Design a protein with these regions (language model features):
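Anionic-ligand-binding alpha/beta catalytic cores of soluble enzymes and soluble regulatory domains
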Residues: 194-243
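Non-catalytic regulatory appendages
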Residues: 223-272
Length: 336
């Protein structure tokens, strides 16, 4: 790793609270623009690894769909901003429904769902029973799919979210997305580069789920610093803070921001390990980083810690990794 690549990794690990601590899970989620929660325990692992307390975590954040249809735990007050790029997003089930009924009729269904939620019906299972006599099974399956169905559309409109971080049921909310203008986009970019920088515009487009062309003609916020590396320009916020050293050993959660938030991941995730970390299903496993680069995977299986390195590591590294996973196991016991 050359000096510039090392500088990039050092700044990223600082920004993502991997070389310093963030004790407040709400601040952590706000700074990172949400915590990935395909599996809700990812939030617990990610927060603990970064030093955040877990008391009341299930209701401290709001679970909803954001970037590229991924589930995140976010600060409720941030929803209008974070939902702005996705206000018109639909689930694939919604798109399939358009082949079977008009958009006006889909809207009638949506209005009925919102009305039922106002009357206290929150679960997809209950909704299925209520709608069973009015629609064919295929429509019911699309509407109330376990992958989200029509609730993805409602969530992107800021009308519903999960009842808490571990629930499968929904609540009505009132968080209409901000209009997606240049001011909102600039604020999203500023926040992204403050936490995830140094990063490229391609990284920002990937993270936010936008077409890169959307960002090409937008003025880059003036407060951003930049560096050139390889064939790219990397933006970041230089606040004069001590970046600290790259930790010799770091646990990363499943779908950890250090891995999944960037279009180009080679600096952190060596190509030869990619298939072992990111499965064909899209799941990103919990990993162990040695000197800022992924070197193995870890997990809690049946409550027992496991660590598997991809290549030979010194005994002190293997022992330290096992101890970190074991400490995490005891720290989160009863939380997930």
């Amino acid at each position: 790793m050359d000096k510039t690549a090392e500088q990039i990794i050092r700044r990223r690990m600082h920004g993502l609270y991997l070389s310093r601590k963030c004790e407040d899970i709400t601040r952590l989620s706000r700074d990172l623009m949400g915590l990935h929660c395909w599996f809700h325990r990812n939030v617990v692992f990610s927060a603990h690894i970064r030093g955040a307390g877990l008391t009341g975590w299930k209701r401290a954040l709001t679970k909803t769909w954001l970037y590229r249809g991924t589930l995140h735990g976010v600060v409720y007050e941030d929803l209008p901003l974070l939902l702005a790029p996705h206000a018109r997003d639909h689930s694939w089930e919604h798109l399939l429904l358009r082949e079977m009924m008009s958009e006006d009729r889909i809207q009638e269904v949506i209005d009925r769902i919102v009305g039922l939620m106002g009357d206290g019906v929150y679960s997809r299972a209950e909704m299925r029973k209520i709608f069973a006599d009015d629609y064919e099974q295929r429509v019911i399956d699309y509407l109330f799919s376990s992958w989200g169905g029509i609730f993805v559309t409602l969530a992107c409109q800021g009308k519903v979210a999960f009842r808490d971080m571990t629930s499968r049921d929904f609540d009505l909310i009132d968080a209409p997305p901000l209009p997606m203008d240049d001011h909102v986009l600039s604020e999203l970019l500023r926040r992204f580069f403050a936490a995830y920088g140094p990063a490229t515009l391609a990284d920002a487009a990937w993270f936010l789920g936008l077409d890169k062309n959307t960002l090409i003609n937008l003025p880059v916020p003036e407060e951003l610093s930049r560096l050139e590396y390889g064939h790219g320009i990397y933006y970041y916020v230089d606040d004069g803070a001590d970046m600290g050293d790259i930790p010799a050993l770091t646990l990363l959660s499943g779908f950890d921001p250090l891995i999944v938030s960037y279009k180009e991941r080679g600096a952190v995730l060596p190509e030869e390990y990619k298939k072992a970390v990111i499965l064909k299903s899209g799941i990103c496993l919990p990993t162990v980083a040695v000197n800022g680069q992924v070197a193995g995977i870890w997990n809690l299986k049946n409550g027992k810690p496991t660590v598997e390195f991809f290549a030979s590591q010194p005994q002190r590294i293997r022992k330290a990794a096992a101890e970190l996973v074991d400490e995490l196991r005891w720290s989160v016991a009863g939380t997930i």
